[in-house]
Amino acid sequence: TTSETILGNQSLAFRNPALNNLNEDSLTHISFSNVEWLGNIVDDMGYNYVGIKRGKLDYSLLYFNYGEQKFTDESGIVNGKFSPSTLVLGVGWGTNLLYKGSRVDSVSLGFRGKAVFHDLYTEKTDGLLLDVGLHFHKLYGMVNLDLGVSNFGYMTKINGYEIDQPSALNIGFHIPIKDKWDIYNQWNLYDGYHTHGQGVSYNLKNMFWVNAGYYND
């Protein structure tokens, strides 16, 4: 979503499926986002996101357009243009963690299944991926800790080649301060490298929010 991107790509704090367990109202929450990606380099790459939450379930649609590309033959002659894209459909669910048959109120567990469709013009691939998340609510009375493993599953081959999933271990924390400030940090550990995002949000009487963040890989 736009907010998580501005705050340094804080996906766990906003989309950890375990957070669905904390949704106690019966309302349907709908969010829309449009984000331009690498806007200082290209002007046609970005994604649209739609999210729906109700009770302990969430539904999402992500469409990523990678921008216009040139299609060439073996001699390098341009034969046309195309726009590769990815579509991701997701369903998430959250619940309390059980320990020895008893519910642990401060810990939630969640799962999200995703159907992924890549369209690379001459080649297409699809697959099924799974995210698993844990949420520890207000550790020591103030720290919200999120843990997750993301993008584990199966993708079909493209032209006989295996497709690597961006599987990762995700660790994040969120510290609310006096109902005005929120501090975010998240680390994403991939095979051979990692990324990190941090952000801060200021809430003015629940009427106006100022968000800032930084992301590096």
Predicted regions and their residues:
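Subset of outer-membrane beta-barrel
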Residues: 1-217
